[in-house]
């Protein structure tokens, strides 16, 4: 049994997330966490809301609420939606927690102690129209590198190049759109990432198993242009972690807060400490996951995120960890994702474009969405959500293949033998061939899941479902029953065991449907199959079952058209 630490990029507090956010981090992280638990590993799965920075301040102002109150309410909303989507976090924390505040200040103090913090007088953009300094991400303009006209002052989302606001061509306030901007002098703390460049470069080179998407972005930031730059880690804002050197005041930094991208990744650690607190455990309980001098050297740490978060997780956060000089656990594997697009354009939280998590659940249960999103995960390139594709995938994969199989087998058994596994007959060459085929496919499925190859795993799982359907069609128990009820009983006995087998294997993808099938099979305690032949004999003759409710309903053309129309504009 291994110990696996899993973190998902933490979502901003400023509103309910769309399906593109979900498939880029939380959902594949949940898939892996559920699979790892099913295989018997000890798992710690941490996520949180990212509550600091200008987005939180602006969203609270728009809602007419104090920012702390707004964040508390939105955390509750996001937590509830996550539960309804079946996201199995061990803890869903808050970056505004006291734990994160203390840890962020602690790391800053250690970095300063080690000569890796520099005080810099710099010029920062002030917006007269907004009456405030503008954080980097709230200045928009044209990227000097690729010409994208909605580049932000910290990074171009189009080419991923790291930017400063003064690099932008024709800059404007992202808040008001005003171009009445003035550059003023202010003092900030910088993390001397450049001093750790060689160490970071060597560390990334050692990660030969990382996805190309992850390493290529990290290398670009390390070597393009002037190479890795020092990074400002403080801001002139009211809301955030107050700047302190450990527990001491930091002269000249009064009234400033740490940059959201400095404190947000530290919340992975703080969130684990919050988990310990919530469960009445001492610090040793969370330190064994994070301190290599206290047991974390045995932990495999995996992070999930969208590609726009890669630079901060491959460079800035590791620089914080390395620079502290303390024995903290560094990430072992970063699984990054491209973007999910929506009917030819971008999903957008700020513009309200696309389908959002709460809206999705108003239409259909979570498993419909989980299956489509994971089986179309944007791993090697961007993926596009279309209502036609969604309908086809749900109807063919979930309704026609998996749901139809469970329905046919259980209903036929009930009509001919009653609601218990029938006795009689024995497995023959066809059944042995199916067991051999499923053994090969199960090992392939496990291999893809171990490697976090999400789309390949989904395709293999579907192939496992299809194999059972093809067997049932060829074996034709409805015909065999007329002349040899015992032989038909053996076919149906295998079929009922296949329903149980499928439910166990499908649980990481579609947990609610899997749980319903296992309840119907009265096999809630079913564990991951080691041997396929044993798994397909797990329900013996005489074992009671119930015919399950419709596992997945088909999506009609009328529904598809209505939803496409409903979500063709932007959210209010």
UniProtKB/Swiss-Prot annotation:
Residue positions of motif 'HIGH' region: 11-21
Motif 'KMSKS' region: positions: 346-350
Swiss-Prot/TrEMBL cofactor(s): Zn(2+)
Keywords in alphabetical order: Aminoacyl-tRNA synthetase, ATP-binding, Cytoplasm, Ligase, Metal-binding, Nucleotide-binding, Protein biosynthesis, Zinc
GO molecular function, one term: ATP binding
Pfam families assigned: Anticodon_3 (PF19303), tRNA-synt_1g (PF09334)
Binding residues for Zn(2+): 143, 146, 156, 159
PANTHER family xref list: METHIONINE--TRNA LIGASE (PTHR45765), METHIONINE--TRNA LIGASE, CYTOPLASMIC (PTHR45765:SF1)
Name of the molecule in the record: Methionine--tRNA ligase
Organism (species): Dinoroseobacter shibae (strain DSM 16493 / NCIMB 14021 / DFL 12)
């Amino acid at each position: 049994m291994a110990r696996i630490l899993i973190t998902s990029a933490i979502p901003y507090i400023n509103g309910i997330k769309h399906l593109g956010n979900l498939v880029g981090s939380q959902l594949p992280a949940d898939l892996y966490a559920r699979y790892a638990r099913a295989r018997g590993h000890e798992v710690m799965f941490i996520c949180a809301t990212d509550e600091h920075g200008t987005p939180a301040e602006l969203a609270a102002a728009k809602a007419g609420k104090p920012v702390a109150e707004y964040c508390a309410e939105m955390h509750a909303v996001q937590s509830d939606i996550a539960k309804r989507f079946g996201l199995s976090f061990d803890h869903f924390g808050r970056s505004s927690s006291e734990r994160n505040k203390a840890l962020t200040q602690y790391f800053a103090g250690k970095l300063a102690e080690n000569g890796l913090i520099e005080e810099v007088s710099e010029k920062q953009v002030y917006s007269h129209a907004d009456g405030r300094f503008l954080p980097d991400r709230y200045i928009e303009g044209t990227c000097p590198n690729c010409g994208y006209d909605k580049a932000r002052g910290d990074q171009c989302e189009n080419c991923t190049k790291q930017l400063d606001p003064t690099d932008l061509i024709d800059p404007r306030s992202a808040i008001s759109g005003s171009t009445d901007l003035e550059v003023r002098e202010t003092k900030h703390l910088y993390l001397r990432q450049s001093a750790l460049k060689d160490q970071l470069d060597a560390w990334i080179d050692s990660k030969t198993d990382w996805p190309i998407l992850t390493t290529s972005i990290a290398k670009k930031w390390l070597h393009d242009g002037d190479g890795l730059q020092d990074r400002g880690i403080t801001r002139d804002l009211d809301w955030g972690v107050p700047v302190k050197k450990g527990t001491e005041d930091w002269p000249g930094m009064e009234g400033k807060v740490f940059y959201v991208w400095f404190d947000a990744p530290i919340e992975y650690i703080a969130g684990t400490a919050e988990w310990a607190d919530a469960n009445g455990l001492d610090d040793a309980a969370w330190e064994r996951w994070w301190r290599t001098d206290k047991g974390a050297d045995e932990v495999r740490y995996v992070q999930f995120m969208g590609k726009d978060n890669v630079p901060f997780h491959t460079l800035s956060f590791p620089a914080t960890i390395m620079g502290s000089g303390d024995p903290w656990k560094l990430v072992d594997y970063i699984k990054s994702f491209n973007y999910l697009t929506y009917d030819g354009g971008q999903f957008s939280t700020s513009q309200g474009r696309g389908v959002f998590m709460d809206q999705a659940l108003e239409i259909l249960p979570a498993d419909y969405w989980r299956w489509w999103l994971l089986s179309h995960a944007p791993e090697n390139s961007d993926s596009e959500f279309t209502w036609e594709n969604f309908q086809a995938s749900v109807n063919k994969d979930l309704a026609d293949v998996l749901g139809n199989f469970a329905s046919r087998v259980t209903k036929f058994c009930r009509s001919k033998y009653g609601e218990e596994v029938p006795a009689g007959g024995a497995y023959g060459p066809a059944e042995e061939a199916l067991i051999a085929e499923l053994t090969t496919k199960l090992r392939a499925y496990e291999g893809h899941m171990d490697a976090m190859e999400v789309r390949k795993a989904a395709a293999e799982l579907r192939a496992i479902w299809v194999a059972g359907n093809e067997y049932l069609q060829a074996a034709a128990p409805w015909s065999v029953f007329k002349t040899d009820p015992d032989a038909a009983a053996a076919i149906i006995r295998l079929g009922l065991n296949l329903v149980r087998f499928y439910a166990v294997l499908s649980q990481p993808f579609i947990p609610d449907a899997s749980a319903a099938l296992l309840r119907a099979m009265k096999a809630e305690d079913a564990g991951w199959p080691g041997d396929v032949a044993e798994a397909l004999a797990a329900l013996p003759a005489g074992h009671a079952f119930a015919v399950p409710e419709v596992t997945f309903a088909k999506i009609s053309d009328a529904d598809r058209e209505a939803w496409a129309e409903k979500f063709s504009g932007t959210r209010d």
